[in-house]
Amino acid sequence: DEYAYKLFYDLLDRSERGAYDDDFLVQLAAYREAAPDSERADIFAARYLLAQNDPAGAALCGERAFRRRTMSTAAWNVLAAAHRRLGNAADAAVFESYAYRFDHGQAPACSPEMNAAALARLTRAMNGCLDAPLTKRRAAVENNTLTFHPDVFVGEYLPVTVPDGSDRFWVGTYADGGFLSDRGYMIADVRAKDWFHDNICRDFPFDLQKAHEVKGTVQIEVPEGRAVILPLGGTAPLQELIVQTPSHDDQLAYLGKWSYSHLRLCETTTLICEDDAPFAVGAPILLGHSPARKKLVLNILLDALPWNVVRPHFAEWMPNIARFFARGTIFDEHFSTSEYTYPALPAIETGRYAHHTQLFCAESSHELAPEILTLAECMKDLGYHTAAPITSPDGVYNGTMRGYDRLITATWQLPSLLGTSRAIHHIEAFGEADLFAFLHLSDVHPWDAMGLHFAAEVETRLPLAQRLFAWEKATASVRLPDFEIYKAQFRAGLSDADRNIGALLSYIERRYSDDEFIVSLYSDHGSSVFTPRPEGAEPDIIGENSTRAAWMMRGAGVPEGVVAQELTSIVDLYPTLAHLCGFPAASDIDGSLPAVFGGRERDAVYSFCMYPGQTYKLAMRTKTHALRLETRTPVERDGTADFAGAQVGIYPRGHELTEGRALDGRELRAFFYPRARDFVREFANNAEFFAPRD
C-alpha cells in the first residue's frame, strides 16, 4: 500500500523532528483511514500525546498498540515514558526491561515501589516464557541496587495471571511417592546454581496448584452430605497441623517442605498451625458427578508424532492405540499450524493461530490476553476439576495453562511410562469428581544427538556406520537431519508410548462406559528426521513431514469406526470439544468444527513459520495442491513481515518446492491467492519500520 507507506514515513519524519502540530494530526487521521488496523497509528498518537503532556492518554494508546503487537519496541518505549510521567515506576520498569533485554536499552532503575509484587513482575519481564517455575534472572534489591540472579519460584506464588476469582499457582515440588521434604531440601540448596538451571532441572518435577497461603487458622466449609478433597502445601519439614472436626477429637496432620498432600473432608473442618510457618490451602475439590458433564475428558499430546510417517504402519507400530481408537474417529489429513511446540500448544488450547495469540517467540515475557479463553478455563467453568499430571512448562508463564487447577511439570523429560502412571493415580484419587486432564508426552520427540543418551535397543542394534556420525554443531530439533539413529530412536519411543498409553486406555475402558468419557490423542507437529535432504541444504521446516500431525478421538458423541479424510487443523480441537462438552466457543476463533461432527469441511489448512529472524513461510494446503510462500526478508521481532517480492508457488501435494513441478493455472491462482492475502494481511507490515533496517 504505497499511500499508507508514504503517510507512515511522513509521520515518522515529523515525529523525529518533534513536529507535533495540527498538520501532524491531519496526517495521522489520513493514516488511520488508510491503515485502520495498524497499531502504528496508536504509537504515533501516543507520541503526540506525550508531546502534549498527556501521559494518561498516551498510555491508553500505547496499551492498544501493545495488545496488538506485544513485541513492539515502539510500543514499549511510549508505555515506559507514559508510566514514568504518571508516577507508575513499577509499570515503567516492566517496559524498560523489555527494551533492556531486546534493544540494549537502559536497565530499569531501582525505586521505592520495588516491593515483592513489583520485583516479581520485573522478574517476569526480564525472562522468557520457558521453564516455569525456573527463572534465570530474578530481580532483587541489594544495597539499594537492582540485581538479577538465577532462582526458582518455590514455596511461593508464581507470578502469572490467573482467571478472575481463581487462586494463584502456589509452587511446590512433586514428591512422587517418596518422602515429602526430600525434593524441598534439594531445591533449597540448588535453586541459585547455574548447573541446575542448565542441566539437572530437566527431570525435576514441580507441583503447581491453585492455592492461597495461610498463617494460623483456616476453616474449610463442606456442604452437608458432600465430601471434598483439600490440597495442602507445607513450608517446613514435618510441619504440624491440628485438624478439628465436629465429630472427632483433634488430630495431627504432617506436611512436607514445599510439597503437597491431600485430605478428604466430609464435614466442615478447622486447620490450625501453631507456629509462624505459613502453609498453602488449595481450592477444595467438591466430589460428585453431574449428568451435564462427562466423568473423564482426557487430552493426550504425543509431541512431534508425524502422522503421515506413522499412518501406513499404524496397526503394526501402535497396535494398542490403534485398537482403542478403531472405535472412534481418526483424522487422516490433519495439520499443525507451526513446526514446533511453543506456538502450537497455544493454538491447540485456544483454537487460534499464533498471530492471534501473539505467542510465537519463547523469549517474550507477555501472557495470553485475558479475553482469550483456554480449553481448561472453559472446562473449569463447566465444573470440571482440571489438571495436567505431566506437562512441559512451555505454556505456564505465557498463560496457556492458566485454567488448570494443578500442573505437574518438568522442563524436558516427559516419558509416557511416568505420565500414564500418574494419570491412573490421578483418576483413582480424584475420579469421584468430573475430570478434565491433559498429558504432554515426549517419547517420540527428536533431540540433538550430541549429548543425548539413546535407548539401549537403539545403541546396541545399529551398525557403527549409523550409530556414530560426524555432527559438530548443536541443532534445533526442527532442523535435525534424517540420520538412521534418529529414526531408530523414534521407533523405540513410539513402542514405549504405545505400550504405556495402551495400558492407560485399557484402564479407561474397564473403568468407564463409552458415554462417560472423551479421549483425544494428538500431536502438535511432525518431525524433520524423516525428510531426506542433501548435505548443506536447508530443511523444509513446514513440509508435510514437519507439520502433518495426528488426531484421533473416542467416546461420548464421537462417531465410531470413522477414518475421516477431510482437512483438519490443530486449532479445530477447541471447537470440537466445545461441541462435545457444551461450552460456547467464541465466534472469532480460527478453528472450525469438522464435518464429521456436523460442521463444514475446510477447503484449506494453514501451516506457517513466523520465527523472528527467519523468513516467514506459509504452506496453504488443499487435498490436492499446496501454495508455498516465503518472504525475502526475516520476520520482525514483533511478528510482522514484509511480503513485497515474496516467492510464491503452487504445487501438487507431495511435490512441494520440487523443481519443475510448480503449476500456474488461472483457477488455482483464483483459489489460493485471495485466501493467502487474507491470511497474512493482519501481520503484513508494509515495510513500515520505526527503526532503520540493516
Regions found by a protein language model. Name each.
Residues 2-13, 101-694:
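Catalytic domains that recognize anionic headgroups
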Residues 13-26, 50-62:
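Helix-turn-helix repeat elements of alpha-solenoid scaffolds
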Residues 84-106:
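TPR/TPR-like (Sel1-like) alpha-helical repeat modules
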Residues 25-29, 63-67, 97:
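Alpha-solenoid helical repeat scaffolds
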Residues 6-10, 40, 44, 78, ...:
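"A position-specific structural signal for the A-helix of alpha-solenoid helical repeats
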Residues 35-37, 70, 103-104:
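Short coil turns that delineate tetratricopeptide repeat
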